[in-house]
Amino acid sequence: MAAVPGSAATAPYSTKDALVTVHDGPDGTHTAVIDTRLYVPRHAPALYYTRVPRATCRADVVPLPATRIKLKRKFTWITPNLQHDMHDGTPAQASAWLHAFLGGPHGVLHRAPYTRGHTAVFIWFDSSSQTGDVETPLPFIVISPSTPERVAVRPLNHFSALRTWESMLHLPCVGAACFVKGLRIPFHL
């Protein structure tokens, strides 16, 4: 899940630009690329940025707070734990967590950055079930105050998301994202 505007993947990396939060991630040594019971580092892309100084990564890759998450950065990448992203958990567990995280008393959708139209929430899956298949149609949900209820008729993928974030941050496209259309127009972002 990502709360945007922004793209940590291509932004000039600084603590003012991006924050990566990992649900049930390790404390203190967040840059360690190790698996714990409910956390896997592969879901936090910033851990693999080799040009980011270790001290910066430690400051910008943090455990997901149990209460309010701060939405003060241009881009916040939010990674649920394996139970709440349905890798190891059930759809009911993931739904309950997402409902509380987005719509609960301190949920993202009740916070000023969202209600004022400064935040969009993207929810998508990187693979289907346990197969790891990325070719299957996968859920890709965009939530923002300006996004109407609609279904996209064209295929969307990770590059569509990256292109959208780059556009929202006014950054140049990189790699394969340069060859796809973003989502700003169809989703009124």
Model segments located where?
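N-terminal pro-sequences and low-complexity stem/linker regions of secreted or lumenal proteins
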Residues: M1-L189
